[in-house]
Amino acid sequence: MTRANARELAVHLIYGREFTGEEPEQIVATRLNKEYYGLLAEENEVYSDRPSKAQMQYIDCVVSGVANRTEELNEQIQKFSIGWDVARISKLTRTIMQLAIFEILYVADVPTGVAISEAVRLAKMYDGDDTGSFVNGILGSFARSLPAEV
């Protein structure tokens, strides 16, 4: 499994929390156990390979991190989504941007450009090309606002 696939799994889990309210540790343990994961593999190719130990650590880190910093991440999205109320942005698109901003700020081994590119890719895949452009604009503005060392 690639980091891109692990990122996509993380988006699924973070998005799922929007509806279940499960704690991050609970949703990761439940959705990534062998039995449940096997059922998902029949429906979605991204579940065809199991995450490695390093990928599981990444998934745990970002799912918990986004859950614990949702308000902060949404404030950043709101700040750079000129003319849009963050509540009007689809939950999935918001989830993708939350993950990207979390990665940029808190995951040292993910370069800013990669976080943005992957967010745009996921937004296009799940919400269409226009959404990819929207996400790129918000995340690009966010990235330009950061000090050079971030």
Annotate the PLM regions:
Residues 1-132, 136-150:
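N-terminal interaction/assembly modules
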